[in-house]
């Protein structure tokens, strides 16, 4: 599915002929993704993986020689979801992997800044996520049980990242992210040392392709 390509959507002139604010993002694939009206036809996994591997979690305030990327975070969340629900089906796992995919366009807005600006960003985020879901054969709106699993796994990942990488004390992390999750030594070994951008991009794409193959 990720190999299928359609021609990039043309950039249409605005009515009135004058200059206007640009609301689309040009991708390395050649796509132009309109943030106001995103089309599933303009979503490509190569752009998602490339972008997420270069977007920093925690505003870059993490330990290590490399940023802790949204791509690596997404793989951690998916691993925690699999550990919590071992029988989670392929579509469920794919939805978990893609839960932060809109950030390849809009970046990772930290929670304190979200509190400052309010909920205005959410409409853009929701439109982008719906287009991404449709592109890869998922429902635009996920079932509530799956949404809850994603939220729980995301909070568990945030706790681990906060205490291992972002300098939080255990008590402070519990206050913001809840009780620490149960996880294996393999999860800490495999997902909590920041990777290079190239490695994060490759591993994200490999996991995506594996899920597509079933």
Feature map (PLM): residue ranges:
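Short, low-complexity intrinsically disordered segments enriched in A/P/G/S/L with frequent Arg
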Residues: 9-18
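Metal-dependent phosphohydrolase cores
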Residues: 2-5, 19-214
């Amino acid at each position: 599915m990720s190999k299928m390509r359609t021609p990039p959507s043309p950039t249409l002139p605005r009515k009135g002929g004058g200059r206007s604010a640009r609301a689309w993002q040009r991708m390395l694939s050649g796509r132009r993704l309109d943030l106001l009206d995103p089309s599933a036809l303009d979503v490509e996994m190569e752009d998602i993986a490339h972008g997420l591997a270069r977007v920093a979690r925690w505003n870059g305030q993490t330990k290590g020689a490399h940023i802790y990327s949204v791509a690596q975070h997404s793989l951690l969340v998916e691993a925690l979801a699999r550990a919590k629900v071992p029988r989670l089906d392929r579509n469920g796992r794919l939805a978990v992997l893609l839960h932060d995919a809109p950030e390849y366009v809009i970046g990772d807005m930290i929670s304190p800044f979200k509190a400052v600006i309010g909920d205005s960003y959410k409409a853009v985020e929701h439109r982008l996520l719906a287009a991404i879901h449709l592109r890869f054969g998922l429902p635009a709106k996920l079932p509530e049980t799956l949404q809850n699993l994603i939220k729980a796994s995301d909070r568990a990942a945030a706790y681990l990242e906060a205490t291992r990488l972002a300098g939080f004390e255990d008590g402070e992390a519990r206050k913001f992210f809840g009780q620490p999750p149960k996880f294996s030594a393999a999860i800490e070994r495999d997902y909590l040392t920041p990777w290079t951008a190239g490695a994060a991009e490759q591993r994200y794409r490999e996991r995506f392709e594996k899920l597509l193959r079933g």
